[in-house]
Amino acid sequence: MIDRQLLRKNPDAIRGALDEKGVTDVNLDQILTLDQEWRERKARGDELRHERNQISSKIGKLKAAGDEDAASEAIAQSQELKNELEEIEREADKLKSELDTAMLKIPQVPDDAVPVGTDESENVERRREGFDSLRSLPDTVIPHYDLGEELEILDFERGAKVTGGGFYFAKGDGARLEHALVQFMLDIHREQGYQDVFPPIPVNSQSMVGTGQFPKFTEDAYRIGETNDEPWDNDDLWLCPTAEVPVTNMYRDEILLDDDLPVKIQAYTPNFRREAGEHGTETRGIVRVHQFNKVELVNFVRPEDSAERFDGLLTEAEVVLQRLGLPYRILEMCTGDLGFTQRKKYDIEVWAPGDDMATGPDIGGRWLEVSSVSNFGAFQSRRAGLRYRPERHESASYLHTLNGSGVAVPRVMVAIMEYYQNDDGTITIPEPLQPYMNGLSVIEGHDPVGEAAVGAGKRE
């Protein structure tokens, strides 16, 4: 949530943010009017409360002095003020509820240093890593979705049968590779000073509001027990779309001490999102699916440390790809491609050579986003009540929150399957991962499991 003082003192800055982020469904003039009317009601309520307290304090003295008529008149005045105060408070509460709801729709204001642009085509590539010494690739790199089926390590048909489109089985060495990547990532970030957390997978609506998923992205979430178009309460449950939600809300409505900071937490979770590919290869394979594994890095820092920690977080996420020997690039998001909650963001995109895309590098292949490293400033903290106290006797201030994937597992699997593919259709396992797979160095596939039974038990 944006700073309400900023809204009042510099509404043009908010208008600029709405324009830069392409937000058209926020009526800022209406919000400013609501805020003004709420403050007027609140001020009037304070006046009435003060006036009533003064009159009430006289009643006892008047009775003690034997002036019953004056005491009765004062009691009547006090009751009138009480009635008026209750009406004013009802109006103020209604206005505040409308204002709070409207404020949740205003996006974060971009950092002044963010490049201005309208959409992803104007993002800025900052650097590329790992392209100076590429390994030799087959003349034709088989896309991961075909290779995964050939090697019997990915099964899309059965995933669709069991659950639906956008779900898959990782099998045999494919499952082992996925597990190995998770443990590999957790070990790396543990070295970097991260605390491990394994959070609840269902999260309530209030948590989704706290991190900014709601109310804007309700349609992308999986709701437990109800349909998405029904009204939701704060305690309704949803499947976790990212560990950012439960981890950030761990400290919701709490005050941390300065000595606690920075807090660095990592969490592995399965993540659930309704989004799906719209065309082409996005509907095939494991690039964009409804359930995927990810290690998330969440930081809670002092405002003055926010920029430096943002750079540090980017470096920490990059280490995963560096150790795996995967080529990648760093993109800085322009204003038009910043998310709703983000003040500044970098994307880490790994190179996957199996599918040639128009937006890919000149040597072919495609870019796959495996991490978004984001600085939210105090935006999430205001929504979730995340504060810290610089000194024990000082007033509490809002924290800054940052997060980044460290990293998304399926897309790294895609990059490994395509970049470490050999001429004979096998996959070399990057050396740092081999200890996590009991020394296995090459995925050669395995005999089909239960293929003779496919269709045999199908009901007519």
From Swiss-Prot:
It catalyses: tRNA(Ser) + L-serine + ATP = L-seryl-tRNA(Ser) + AMP + diphosphate + H(+); tRNA(Sec) + L-serine + ATP = L-seryl-tRNA(Sec) + AMP + diphosphate + H(+). Keywords: Aminoacyl-tRNA synthetase, ATP-binding, Cytoplasm, Ligase, Nucleotide-binding, Protein biosynthesis. Its EC number is 6.1.1.11. It is found in: Cytoplasm. Its main location: cytoplasm. CDD domains: SerRS_core. Homodimer. The tRNA molecule binds across the dimer. Belongs to the class-II aminoacyl-tRNA synthetase family. Type-1 seryl-tRNA synthetase subfamily. PANTHER family: SERINE--TRNA LIGASE (PTHR43697:SF1), SERYL-TRNA SYNTHETASE (PTHR43697). This is Serine--tRNA ligase.
